[in-house]
Design a protein with these regions (language model features):
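Substrate-binding/catalytic subdomain of NAD(P)-dependent oxidoreductase enzymes
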Residues: 192-233
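Terminal low-complexity tails and localization/encapsulation signals of metabolic enzymes
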Residues: 1-13, 247, 270, 333-408
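Mid-domain beta-loop-alpha active-site segment that forms a flexible
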Residues: 174-189, 208-216, 260, 264
Length: 408
């Protein structure tokens, strides 16, 4: 019999005091690979429990796919940190933790006595992982930040990726949060590794704004005034006409991608039936294309050429000629994508009442480590009794704390 594979983060305990998407997603991935994550919610619960109302997805206890993305496998409790008994119970939890993960704003943490300085003094080995909208310093440190504001609006893409003059594009809910969670996860893992050699915890932080800048790093550099990059792009004047999007005869679009214009120019010129441009000095370089505005003529011709065939034919033709391309797909396509299913990037999860949903999975895999299977996240306070029994509380003490509102 094949030996059971272990998970790489077994033995790590994380106490999470966080809501919505980015921070809980980081701890969700820690949990998927073996960490024990105890999620502490308020009396009314993480607002992510109700996000389905906004996205038209069911959001009931034991049948809450959106909440499950971020919280599968976690142990769930609810503590009132303003209640003395609740605060004491929370500190007792922290005594057992390797990581404290939170996105509560720093001033609020200070008022609760949960600031880094206080906790580092009490628990010097604790990794204190803090997530925010705009970062822990500067004039906007205490400003509330969301995916749409701090990631998309503040770092530029909401304005600069749109078609000129159009309404700002609207990304799906929490796209930037999910991207940023990977940066947060990386920082936490580095802090855990560092603790193994030093024995000391640290304050590790990231923010939606930091991630927005990092994800958009090429644009942030190339659009500084000394370089002159400009966006939004004119659809007739892309940087490279062979790295652009074209509409096909069936009304669907395809993206063609070439990262070495000068080397690939003869190939593309012949593929698209315009061999003469390979020797045209106006097409000799990307600089020449734009200095002469010859790019407009090429794109206009390519627009007409692509409208002679449906997208499937273009996709087959370009792939046969080793051209990187992809039809523009919709989000609806992903849940049935054979490539995604074959690689385990999405998997079927059955919720209460036999509701089946194709759920996105953490985007990393190992040959020698296991990953915790997807399970439906439970109701508010689902694991309170077992969590506090593990801390040494008796059943009468747990009942008394529930009666006082300290826990739920």
């Amino acid at each position: 019999m094949e030996q059971m594979k272990k998970m790489p983060l077994e033995g790590i305990r994380v106490v999470e005091l966080a809501t919505v998407v980015a921070a809980p997603t980081a701890s969700r991935v820690l949990c998927a690979f073996g960490a024990e994550v105890i999620k502490v919610e308020t009396k009314i619960g993480d607002e992510m429990r109700r996000a389905g109302e906004f996205e038209m997805v069911v959001c009931e206890d034991d049948k809450n796919p959106l909440f499950t993305i971020q919280n599968s496998g976690k142990r769930l409790t609810s503590i009132d940190l303003k209640n003395p008994d609740g605060k004491a119970a929370f500190l007792k939890l922290l005594e057992t933790a390797d990581v404290f993960l939170t996105n509560v704003r720093l001033p609020s943490l200070g008022r609760l006595g949960l600031d880094y300085e206080t906790l580092h003094k009490a628990y010097p080995g604790l990794v204190y992982a803090h997530f925010s909208g705009f970062g822990p310093k500067g004039p906007d440190a205490a400003k509330p930040g969301f995916d749409s504001t701090a990631f998309w609006l503040r770092s530029g893409p909401m304005a600069d990726w749109q078609v000129p003059g159009s309404f700002p594009f609207t990304p799906t809910y929490a796209f930037g949060d999910m991207a940023t969670s990977s940066a947060f996860l990386s920082g936490i893992l580095m802090a855990i590794i560092g603790k193994k050699s030093t024995g000391m915890g640290t304050f590790v932080s990231t923010s939606l704004f930091a991630s927005g800048i990092w994800c958009n790093a090429i644009g942030v550099v190339s659009h500084q005034p000394q370089f002159g990059g400009e966006r939004p792009n004119d659809p007739l004047r892309p940087a490279d006409p062979f790295c652009h999007f074209y509409e096909c005869s069936d009304g669907k679009w395809i993206g063609v991608f070439d990262n070495e214009y000068r080397r690939e120019l003869p190939k593309f010129a012949n593929l698209f039936g315009m061999p003469e441009i390979a020797d045209d000095p106006r097409a000799a370089s990307l600089e020449a294309l734009h200095e002469t505005d010859f790019v407009v003529e090429i794109v206009t011709r390519l627009n007409a050429i692509f409208k002679t065939r449906p997208v499937a034919e273009w996709e087959a033709f370009l792939s046969e000629n080793n051209v990187s391309c992809e039809r523009v797909r919709t989000i609806r396509d992903v849940s049935t994508d054979e490539q995604a299913i074959a690689n385990g990037y999405i998997q079927k999860v059955t919720f209460k009442d036999d509701l089946e949903v194709m759920m996105p999975c953490p985007p990393m895999q190992f040959t020698e480590y296991a990953m915790r299977p997807y399970t439906s996240a439970g109701r508010l306070g689902a694991d309170t009794d077992s969590i506090f029994r593990d801390l040494g509380y008796t059943d009468p003490e747990i009942a008394a704390m529930k009666a006082s509102g300290a826990i739920r």
